[in-house]
């Protein structure tokens, strides 16, 4: 027991649980809903293995059940499982609604953080541009004229080219009816003052599931969608 390797992070504990109980936990992909009270089952089965403590198990379980992939699996009709994968009852509507709100709040936090980071980058770039010292240009010495040479007439300066009219800021059309959308359709998702390209994956009663160019998918309400 003394020579057993120690798991130092919740992610390592989750990977261990996925290997130890593959019919219950998964290290990637959509996760299955867990039995209510599964923490006590875990304590009885694995406490002491890999030098695991109750605190480590509780932290790993909290991280696992708050992940997006776990919350995606909380759907009406889905069945909870125990450590061995045996069914332990269907999810009720209250738990499904709670998971949906958790997922929406988590996505909103991520979008807000990204918008804040982009705003800080723009502010930093603007500040660096204003504070950068300008180099003074030294005047060039005038060329010496040969007294015997004739003065050449100055060439007329070409007329200044007309500056092109500034491009009008692109305006986006808000999506008023999500039922008019179709799977595979391209649109944009508003995040702060920015609009990110996305593709429609699914139209649900809660909104539209889209996939960003980064590969991340999320459910977005109609007021955050534009063309």
Curated annotation (Swiss-Prot):
Transmembrane segments: none
Subcellular location, record wording: Cytoplasm
Location of region: Disordered: 105-179
Basic and acidic residues bias: start-end ranges: 144-159
One BP annotation, GO: post-transcriptional regulation of gene expression
Record has Cytoplasm as a keyword: yes
Source organism superkingdom: Bacteria
One cellular component term from this protein's GO annotations in UniProt: cytosol
The keyword Nuclease is assigned to this record: no
Keyword set, alphabetical order: Chaperone, Cytoplasm, RNA-binding
UniProt cross-references to SMART domains, sorted A to Z: ProQ
GO molecular function, one term: RNA strand annealing activity
Family: Belongs to the ProQ family.
Task performed by this protein: RNA chaperone with significant RNA binding, RNA strand exchange and RNA duplexing activities. May regulate ProP activity through an RNA-based, post-transcriptional mechanism.
Protein name as annotated: RNA chaperone ProQ
The organism of origin for this protein: Enterobacter sp. (strain 638)
Taxonomic lineage: Bacteria, Pseudomonadati, Pseudomonadota, Gammaproteobacteria, Enterobacterales
Gene name in the database record: proQ
């Amino acid at each position: 027991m003394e020579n057993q390797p120690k798991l130092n992070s919740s992610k390592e504990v989750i990977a261990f649980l996925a290997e130890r109980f593959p019919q219950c936990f998964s290290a990637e992909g959509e996760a299955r809903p867990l039995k209510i009270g599964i923490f006590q089952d875990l304590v009885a089965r694995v406490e002491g293995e890999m030098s695991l403590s109750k605190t480590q198990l509780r932290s790993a379980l909290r991280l696992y059940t708050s992940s997006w992939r776990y919350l995606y699996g909380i759907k009406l009709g889905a069945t909870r499982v125990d450590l061995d994968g045996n069914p332990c009852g269907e999810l009720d509507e209250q738990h499904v609604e709670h998971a949906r709100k958790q997922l929406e709040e988590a996505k909103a936090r991520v979008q807000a953080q990204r918008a804040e980071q982009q705003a800080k980058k723009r502010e930093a770039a603007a500040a660096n541009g204003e504070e950068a010292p300008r180099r003074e240009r030294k005047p060039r010495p005038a060329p010496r004229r040969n007294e015997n040479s004739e003065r050449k007439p100055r060439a007329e300066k070409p007329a200044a080219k007309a500056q092109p009219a500034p491009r009008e800021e692109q305006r986006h059309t808000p999506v008023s009816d999500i039922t008019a959308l179709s799977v595979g359709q391209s649109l944009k998702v508003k995040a702060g003052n920015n609009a990110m390209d996305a593709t429609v994956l699914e139209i649900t009663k809660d909104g539209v599931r889209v996939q960003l160019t980064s590969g991340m998918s999320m459910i977005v309400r109609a007021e955050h969608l534009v063309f």
